[in-house]
Amino acid sequence: MLTSKGQGFLHGGLCLWLCVFTPFFKGCVGCATEERLFHKLFSHYNQFIRPVENVSDPVTVHFEVAITQLANVDEVNQIMETNLWLRHIWNDYKLRWDPMEYDGIETLRIPADKIWKPDIVLYNNAVGDFQVEGKTKALLKYNGMITWTPPAIFKSSCPMDITFFPFDHQNCSLKFGSWTYDKAEIDLLIIGSKVDMNDFWENSEWEIIDASGYKHDIKYNCCEEIYTDITYSFYIRRLPMFYTINLIIPCLFISFLTVLVFYLPSDCGEKVTLCISVLLSLTVFLLVITETIPSTSLVVPLVGEYLLFTMIFVTLSIVVTVFVLNIHYRTPTTHTMPRWVKTVFLKLLPQVLLMRWPLDKTRGTGSDAVPRGLARRPAKGKLASHGEPRHLKECFHCHKSNELATSKRRLSHHPLQWVVENSEHSPEVEDVINSVQFIAENMKSHNETKEVEDDWKYVAMVVDRVFLWVFIIVCVFGTAGLFLQPLLGNTGKS
């Protein structure tokens, strides 16, 4: 006989033993029930037979695509790489059970290779397997509904138009359908009208504007049957910030540096140097960004057109600069200025361009600067032969000192012509007068030459100013015209 103390100890130990091991037994019972259910479902199951009670009935498959990542868009090879989840839902009448008979089990996770699956493939796959691998498990409910959502990475073919690169939009499609079953055997139904993007990771280069799905029934030339497919169209837009900062803005700066060439004075001697420096910088820049631009010969990208436009722009600036410098350094001994050049470039265009001479020039100042008496002075040896008064000779020997004083006063109060005509004509004076006349004639010739050279320089300045405005207009409107094309093109498509 056990004492009351011993009975209490035995009762407590039994309760503890039951509390510890009862969940284990329940788990074992549950595992046994699930194993019994699995054996019951798949003991006579054939995974190669369509799950229909009547052979003429189609299997209705509900299909949906969920995108998690837009991995890459290869413009050169025209491939779009995406990470997708493909949701398949269909009913298999051979996989039904009563939950009451199996301890309330309502769902099973079963390997996908144990059940019949629709052979849904990506029609426009470019690289890799066309069909999804069945390594994931499917969710089976007691009423026979199967939900299978395998992940897949697809590299699909996508015809791309990079005309407006880097402001381009692309329309890439994913076409899913059964490869062997026609519409009479598998009827595909789309879940929703758009791609599920709840778990989508944003891409740093592309933005998905729209991703709509459509169902198509197509009859191919190879077969008489009608095949059903579901096509998802991804309308994507390139994010142009990277290319704008690293490609377009530097080109804009180079273009406007080219415009400054025409504002640089020709006398500084650095116009051609600046043009060549800009051209070299553009060439080096093109070599650096060659790998960034899609290499294709089908179309010329917008940024390629702009780079070509900038290259032509800089080259023309060099040609025009050489032409302007040629005009700037012309002289009367090498070129004669035509009358139409004087009319157009010295009168008309300066008024149109709001240009004027820095100082008002009086034409003919060079000739007026030469004393008329010296210009009409007789040749040496003939100064006293005609028209010289006789009493002047006699008075010259008698009153030499008085005449010198009088000559000084006359030099200060009378024109030079009067002084020459009424002064002494000794050989020394004649030499001085001839030297002054030679200097005056040289000054006149120099002034006339300087005046013509100034006219040529002013013509070069006018030509520079004309091309300054022409290049500014071409640069602004050319740049705006190129980069407004994507906006106008997208507006026209919409």
UniProtKB/Swiss-Prot annotation:
It is found in: Synaptic cell membrane. Activated by a myriad of ligands such as acetylcholine, cytisine and nicotine. CHRNA6 nAChR activity is inhibited by the antagonists alpha-conotoxin MII and PIA, a small disulfide-constrained peptides from cone snails. The chain crosses the membrane at residues 240-264, 272-290, 306-327, 466-484. GO terms for biological process: acetylcholine receptor signaling pathway; behavioral response to nicotine; membrane depolarization; monoatomic ion transmembrane transport; nervous system development; neuromuscular synaptic transmission; regulation of dopamine secretion; response to nicotine. Residues 328-465 are cytoplasmic. It is a multi-pass membrane protein. Disulfide bonds join 158-172, 222-223. The keyword Cell membrane applies. Component of neuronal acetylcholine receptors (nAChRs) that function as pentameric, ligand-gated cation channels with high calcium permeability among other activities. nAChRs are excitatory neurotrasnmitter receptors formed by a collection of nAChR subunits known to mediate synaptic transmission in the nervous system and the neuromuscular junction. Each nAchR subunit confers differential attributes to channel properties, including activation, deactivation and desensitization kinetics, pH sensitivity, cation permeability, and binding to allosteric modulators. This is Neuronal acetylcholine receptor subunit alpha-6. It comes from Pan troglodytes.
